């Protein structure tokens, strides 16, 4: 007995149940349960046998659930007279009307499997009911008196008076549901009109996904949008020059919109170039926080799809959402993976279309025009570790191209203080001397050193102990201060992640294409 076959049949049964094909789903569930029962006879390991018994029990519950759904649906089809046992307070004329209609219902010989459109399944013998209603027209007016309870038995006659009575009464039953649906439709409009102002008054506005798949919009809002990154300039160590350039290019145009007009218009985009781990993503989040914009954190996975034309639609949807939530900041991390140079031999037609759409959309977000508000500005930030692979057209649109270097000694010391603010330190520790030993380390490398050094005391305390003894160690004994020796040992374990040859390449590219 193949386990893969059991998994496949279980998957098919669940898929058919989700699609509403319950009969086929039951067949698959029955087959799976029989397969598991046969498999249990050949399993002799107690633990494995217990696992399969648990799986069989869970699948049996799913099978019973689908079976109950099928039974309920069959009840709707096979019992058209189910609403007859109505409450005792129903009016008598309806019961007479039904008795008069029942003999007529048996006259025509119809195929029970054929449903006469456009009426529901419960109204299969519709022609006899209509004839019965025409023979006895006074009966149709009688039920309109107890209109509050009448609509439940609309099989006796489906004339206009019933529907008008149902709409006025708002009673229960199927006929009443149709009448109440009309009221709901009319009331739904008023409800929307009432809700619209309250939505506008709320703290957040909702993007209207008209023309787009609702799932695409929800995925972008869930995975990309960050309305409050909560990262400030003080949370980033060093990079004083980069902060100043970003503030001038992104933040100041929102603070002084009257000044940044004409030739002083805001930049179309900013490209941050530098080795990995230098804080490019943190700078982008700080920009979004300082200027109070909606932050879109985009990667290549967010804008690619296996379906033809779907990736271009995602790019267009991203920029439309950014304009809707404006002022916005679109941060495209590792932009070289999306917009590498065009015309290369390894380029695919789909990726070329995505690049073209991205370039077109970036040309359309160059900032507010003369007739637009400054609050509608969309700023594009991009980061890359391989600036020499970026397409020339994209490089032109990213007008500011700044270099994010490795932290200097002051930045390294500040980063040590930020990372160790919640870690107890020994009195004889000197962070400046430790920072001097970290020359050539990136921000991510320094963070790894701090993490490793902060765990040294715990490692010494639990060395040679069994798990039961480790569980009973008091928290105070584990949280011992970190010593200079811990940092020296951590520096021996954590090496640099950026080589000198890479730094030379970055500096050469900035000398040729930099725009600071």
Curated annotation (Swiss-Prot):
Query: Which PROSITE patterns does the UniProt record give?
Result: AAA
Q: What is its EC number?
A: 5.6.1.1
Q: What's known about how it's activated or inhibited?
A: ATPase activity is stimulated by microtubules, which promote homooligomerization. ATP-dependent microtubule severing is stimulated by interaction with KATNB1.
One BP term from GO: cell division
Catalytic reaction equation(s): n ATP + n H2O + a microtubule = n ADP + n phosphate + (n+1) alpha/beta tubulin heterodimers
Extent of Gly residues compositional bias: 168-178
Q: Pfam families, alphabetically?
A: AAA, AAA_lid_3, KATNA1_MIT, Vps4_C
* Keywords, alphabetical: ATP-binding, Cell cycle, Cell division, Cytoplasm, Cytoskeleton, Isomerase, Microtubule, Mitosis, Nucleotide-binding
* Residue positions binding ATP: 274-281
Database matches in SMART domains:
AAA (SM00382)
Positions with biased composition (Basic and acidic residues): 133-143, 155-167, 179-212
List localization entries. Answer: Cytoplasm; Cytoplasm, Cytoskeleton, Microtubule organizing center, Centrosome; Cytoplasm, Cytoskeleton, Spindle pole
Q: Does the keyword ATP-binding apply?
A: yes
InterPro entries under this entry?
AAA+_ATPase, AAA_lid_3, ATPase_AAA_core, ATPase_AAA_CS, KATNA1, KATNA1_MIT, KTNA1_AAA_dom, MT-severing_AAA_ATPase
A GO molecular function term, named singly, is: ATP binding
Q: Its principal location?
A: cytoplasm
Cite the residue spans of the region called Disordered. Answer: 75-212
Query: Which family, according to UniProt?
Result: Belongs to the AAA ATPase family. Katanin p60 subunit A1 subfamily.
Q: What does this protein do?
A: Catalytic subunit of a complex which severs microtubules in an ATP-dependent manner. Microtubule severing may promote rapid reorganization of cellular microtubule arrays and the release of microtubules from the centrosome following nucleation. In mitotic spindles this could allow depolymerization of the microtubule end proximal to the centrosome, and subsequent poleward microtubule flux.
The annotated subunit structure for this chain is: Can homooligomerize into hexameric rings, which may be promoted by interaction with microtubules. Interacts with KATNB1, which may serve as a targeting subunit.
Q: What is this protein called?
A: Katanin p60 ATPase-containing subunit A1
Instruction: Tell me what organism the protein belongs to.
Output: Strongylocentrotus purpuratus (Purple sea urchin)
């Amino acid at each position: 007995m193949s386990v893969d076959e059991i998994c496949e049949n279980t998957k098919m049964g669940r898929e058919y149940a989700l699609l509403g094909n319950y009969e086929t789903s039951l067949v698959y569930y029955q087959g799976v349960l029989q397969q598991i029962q046969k498999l249990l006879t050949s399993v002799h390991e107690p633990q494995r046998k217990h696992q399969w018994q648990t799986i069989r029990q869970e699948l049996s519950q799913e099978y019973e659930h689908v079976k109950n759904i099928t039974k309920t649906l069959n009840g709707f089809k096979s019992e058209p007279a189910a609403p007859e046992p109505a409450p005792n307070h129903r009016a008598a004329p309806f019961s007479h009307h039904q008795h008069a209609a029942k003999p007529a219902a048996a006259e025509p010989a119809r195929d029970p499997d054929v449903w006469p459109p456009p009426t529901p399944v419960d109204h299969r013998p519709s022609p006899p009911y209509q004839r019965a209603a025409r023979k006895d027209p006074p009966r149709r007016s009688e039920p309109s008196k107890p209109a509050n309870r009448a609509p439940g038995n609309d099989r006796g006659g489906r004339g206009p008076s019933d529907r008008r009575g149902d709409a006025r009464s708002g009673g229960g039953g199927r006929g009443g549901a149709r009448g109440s649906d009309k009221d709901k439709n009319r009331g739904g409009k008023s409800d929307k009109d009432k809700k619209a102002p309250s939505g506008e008054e709320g703290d957040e506005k909702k993007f209207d996904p008209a023309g787009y798949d609702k799932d695409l919009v929800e995925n972008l809002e869930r995975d990309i949008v960050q309305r409050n990154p909560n990262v400030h300039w003080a949370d980033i160590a060093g990079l004083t020059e980069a902060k100043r350039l970003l503030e001038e290019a992104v933040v100041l145009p929102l603070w002084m919109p009257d000044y940044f007009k004409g030739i002083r218009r805001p930049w179309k985009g900013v490209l941050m170039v530098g080795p990995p781990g230098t804080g490019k993503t943190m700078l982008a989040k700080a920009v979004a926080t300082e200027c109070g914009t909606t932050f879109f954190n985009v990667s290549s996975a967010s804008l690619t799809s296996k379906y033809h034309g779907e990736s271009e639609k995602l790019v267009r949807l991203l920029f439309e959402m950014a304009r809707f939530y404006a002022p916005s900041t679109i941060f495209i991390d590792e932009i070289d993976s999306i917009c590498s140079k065009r015309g290369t031999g390894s380029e695919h037609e789909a990726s070329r279309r995505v690049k073209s759409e991205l370039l077109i959309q970036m040309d359309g977000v160059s900032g507010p025009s003369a007739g637009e508000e400054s609050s509608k500005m969309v700023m594009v930030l991009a980061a890359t570790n391989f600036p020499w692979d970026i397409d020339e057209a994209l490089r032109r649109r990213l007008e500011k191209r700044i270099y994010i270097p490795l932290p200097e000694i002051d930045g390294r010391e500040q980063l040590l203080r930020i990372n160790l603010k919640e870690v107890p330190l020994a009195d004889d520790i000197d962070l400046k001397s430790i920072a001097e030993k970290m020359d050539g380390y990136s921000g991510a490398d320094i963070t790894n050193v701090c993490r490793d050094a902060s765990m040294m005391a715990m490692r010494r305390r639990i060395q040679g102990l069994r798990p039961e003894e480790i569980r009973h160690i008091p928290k105070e004994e584990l949280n011992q201060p970190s010593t200079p020796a811990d940092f020296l040992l951590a520096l021996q374990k954590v090496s640099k992640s950026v080589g000198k040859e890479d730094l030379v390449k970055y500096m050469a590219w900035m000398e040729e294409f930099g725009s600071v």
